[in-house]
Amino acid sequence: MGDPRKPRKKWSPPGHPWVKERLIEEMKLMGEYGLRNKREIWIAAAMLRRYRHRARELLALPAEVREKEEKALLKRLYDLGLVDENATLDDVLSLTVRDLLERRLQTVVYKKGLAKSIYHARQLVTHGHIAINGRRVTSPGYIVRRDEEELIGYAPTSPYFKKAQQ
């Protein structure tokens, strides 16, 4: 059976806590994307850091070795909707936290017009009114894949679903 793995943090706080420019930028992101706390920004930054680190590792490899892994990384990022179909590793290195926050379920629900505000979108998601392909998703930080984008709608058991049907 084995021992269960120890759950680890998916984020790391900034190195210095009181850098004014970073604090201002984080507050702007929190307001623009309706985030509850800065940890949500740090989680997105950590995820992005992992992708960018992988891209830098691949750039250091010889061309014939990196080709297969480069395609896999670019396909993964394309499926997440972070890069275009004909993207390069330089495009991966130029990704920002803002690009990743645009792919959160909360943001996509607001951009699709299912919610009146970004905060309303968060409430709809957490209260179980939003479903992807008929399956209820209650995490506003869920990263929406490219193929799931058009499948987002109200959950069948939601009162909003009944209003939308009329």
Curated annotation (Swiss-Prot):
Keyword Ribosomal protein: yes
Organism: Ignicoccus hospitalis (strain KIN4/I / DSM 18386 / JCM 14125)
InterPro entries: Ribosomal_uS4, Ribosomal_uS4_arc, Ribosomal_uS4_CS, Ribosomal_uS4_euk/arc, Ribosomal_uS4_N, S4_RNA-bd, S4_RNA-bd_sf
GO CC annotations, alphabetized: small ribosomal subunit
Domain of life: Archaea
Family, similarity comment: Belongs to the universal ribosomal protein uS4 family.
Gene encoding the protein: rps4
Signal peptide (UniProt feature, chain positions): none
Official protein name in the record: Small ribosomal subunit protein uS4
